[in-house]
Amino acid sequence: MIIQGNQLDSLPKAEDWEAFAESYKRIAEVAVMKPVQALLQCLDDRLPLSGAVGILDNGSGPGIIMSSLIERYGPQLPPDCVLTCVDYAPAMIDQVDKARIKAVEEDADSAWGRVEGKVLDALDLHSIADESQSHIAAGLLYNLTTDPAKCLSECKRTLQPGGVLAVSAWEGNDWIEMLRVVPLIKPDLKTAIQPKWSTVDAVRWDLELAGFREVHVQRIPIKIPFTSHALFVDTLMRYQPRMVAMLRTFTEDEKTELRRLLMNEMKVICPSQPGMMSGAVMVGAGVR
């Protein structure tokens, strides 16, 4: 696919995540906690985390998976197990670093003290050695990259033989579907706002094609509570990276009109306020 100049301007950049990082952490903790717990369970079921050599949180964001890992499995982890978070957005790794500092201040023996944050592209994990990881978690990552096969290949390269990769991918969610109103204002953004949804079969196929075995994929439904339509839409427009990137090309009048359209769309999807927005995440795992 050829990306036109105005579409390129609408793609999120690493710096777009800076303002979003803290709010994303709060939202994501609610949105993806069930899939995160399922992802960690997949890792532990296939290869007990009590014997982990290295655990990589690939595309870590602010460290939600790592935080859940340490909270749930921290006492079981071997003392020499290397813990690493990587993300292409420096603002997200800043959040990881803040979480580590806070955790160690509260408990000097916390496994957080061993967490290293690195700014890396998931398509080029050059500072992660071959066969150095026993477990890799890639939450809501691989199918959102420009080259999903390369992302999975890099995961496989860094995994030890017998190591486990657990991934997740959106089947769909209401709040991103709301963006279908954007082309009513800017028709040229129709391609840019198309979401990258997946299915159980697609995730299974991707993992098997990448060479992973004993692949299993499950569907996890989720709900995100909101207090009012206006607050949810304003948060979406102010902090969601894809939205922030698109709004660079909007005039103030266009932003006002977009807010109105988003409010109307949200009321169709979920008329009551407060209410719940719905979505579903695929969680899959495979062994190298």
From Swiss-Prot:
Transferase as UniProt keyword: yes
Q: Which domain of life is it from?
A: Eukaryota
What InterPro entries does this protein's entry cite? Methyltransf_11, SAM-dependent_MTases_sf
Note whether Methyltransferase occurs among the keywords: yes
GO terms (molecular function) for this protein are: S-adenosylmethionine-dependent methyltransferase activity
What biological-process terms (Gene Ontology) are attached?
A: methylation
- What are the binding positions for S-adenosyl-L-methionine in this chain? D87, D121, A122
Q: Which Pfam families match?
A: Methyltransf_11 (PF08241)
User: What keywords is this UniProt entry annotated with?
Assistant: Methyltransferase, Transferase
Which pathway or pathways does this protein act in?
Answer: Mycotoxin biosynthesis
- State its Enzyme Commission number(s): 2.1.1.-
Similarity field: Belongs to the class I-like SAM-binding methyltransferase superfamily.
Known function: Methyltransferase; part of the gene cluster that mediates the biosynthesis of UCS1025A, a member of the pyrrolizidinone family that acts as a strong telomerase inhibitor and displays potent antibacterial and antitumor properties. These compounds share a hemiaminal-containing pyrrolizidinone core fused with a gamma-lactone, giving a furopyrrolizidine that is connected to a decalin fragment. The polyketide synthase module (PKS) of the PKS-NRPS ucsA is responsible for the synthesis of the polyketide backbone via the condensation of an acetyl-CoA starter unit with 6 malonyl-CoA units.
Q: What is this protein called?
A: Methyltransferase ucsB
